[in-house]
Amino acid sequence: MKKLFIIANWMQGKALSGGDRIFIELSKRWSQKLDISIFISKEGADICSRDGQNPANKIIWASDIFSGHYTVDGVYRTIIGIFKALSIRAYQGDIILSSSDFLPDAIPAFILKFKNPKVKWIASFYLFAPKPWQKKSPYKGTKYLLGLVYWLSQLPVYYIIKQFADIVFVTSQPDIKLFITKHRGIEKIIPVRGGVDVLPARQYFEQEEFIPFENRSYDACFVGRFHYQKGILELIHIWKNVCKIRPHSRIAIIGIGPLEKKVHNLIIHMNLQANIDLLGFLNGADKYEVFKKSKIIVHPATYDSGGMATAEAMAWGLPGVAFDLEALKSYYPKGMLKTECFNLGAFANNILYLLSDLNAHLTLSQEALALVKEQWNWEQQAQSILHQIT
């Protein structure tokens, strides 16, 4: 049995990123065909246990001592990862998967590849950092320095992965061409859109006890990290516009992250306490209960490479509303209303349209269900990717 070493040393907090979800779900489904070891942070180990990924070989590298301090924590975890990688023995035929493009994951994987060029390095590179001075960057004003550090730290990683990785996981079709080299053809750059566990939703619909549209508690829901890229602050402004037309509209917000305090303060400032329920981090059955009670899924990301959480909600028949980002064109060709980028008023109008036009809602709902069935099934994704990497 081939060995797979997964490096997930950058996992932080309690929230689950799209990249984290990808390696957890894939490794669950590969565990019978590969001998898997995971080198992970303390927080990452807790997240994996919570999500049912408990391989026999789960080795904790970084502690959470500097968690929340982005730059210091990145340096600490990278140094820990380097020393740990120097002590690992990997042999010809072994597979190394770096779960993100962040330095604490990518650099240790590169060291293992450098020590033994015969191992196969699969590098995950799911999102190019925006140039902080560009118009589309979410890192403006006081966020500029954070965006600059993020962008600068990714430059050496991109070079190393492009030059030395055997296979690259990306999420967006437009990113494929950026990793083609003389030694790596297009077949070695694999778009990994992620997936959805469709079974719970299928069982729910088969029972024929689903909640009618007019009886659902929430007009919309949001799932995602409280991060500038996810548009969580923009969402509060959008919901204010919705409530100007429909004063009693309610939205469920699922997630946690570094912007929690700003989100709380903005809700109070806009007097939306009665219209917005902050539910924190939810997973599994608790999250599904919110989907059952919601009418729409909103994805107001301002910079993104996909958006897997939206597909989860679509599996429960929720049509989506999002900005018309380039990456979403291939991810969500149907089942979603696309809005002119960063026009908050137009975004609110699309929400209001789906809430008032039941025929339009039904059409998009059926499209969403079909899209998930066709393109987002985890079992199909996992088997297809395994075939390509082994």
Which residue stretches match the model-derived regions?
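Short hydrophobic beta-strand element within catalytic cores of glycosyltransferases
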Residues: 319-322
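Aromatic "clamp/platform" in nucleotide-sugar-dependent glycosyltransferases that forms part
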Residues: 302
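Membrane-proximal helix-turn-helix segments that form the acceptor-binding/catalytic region
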Residues: 111-114, 129, 144-168
